[in-house]
Amino acid sequence: EDEAWWQEAVTAARGSLVLILSGHFGNWELLVFAHGMRGHPVHMVHRAMANPRVDRWLHDLRARAGTRMLGKGTAAGGVLGVLHERGLLVLPIDQNSTRRLGVFVDFFGVPASTNSGMARIALRAGAPVVPAFIVREGWRARHRVRVLPLIEVERSGDLEADVQRATQRFTAV
């Protein structure tokens, strides 16, 4: 669904990285799977599950859909690789973050430490940011991918202020 927004993002990327803004909303694993099955190379930053068997099972399932996993602790090097591969990078930003990796933004009226990685990557790489979510329809196992309008990241020359502003805009989606 919303193919026009998707095409706008791909065109804006001019063959480079596209950042997919998402969160742990609905069956977000299906969102990643759907993009991979449509032939778009997908990369995803993830935190290993506490249970190694479950972690391996999820890793294998994601790999079958063409998803390349970037471990949270080693993601920086992987993101540089994605820049060269011109793929999609999916970053769910809705998890609590450390002071070192995040910035505090308003989340439903409450200050919340939010990972600023997407804002930093968008600002440094000039990559378009596309909000995308998956929504279940009714009681059947039917889902619809919702792609929202591209978010332009503003650059003022003050990197930290730009990161703060962009992260707040992403969180508001």
Regions found by a protein language model. Give the residues of each.
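A short, well-structured juxtamembrane/interface segment
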Residues: 1-18, 26
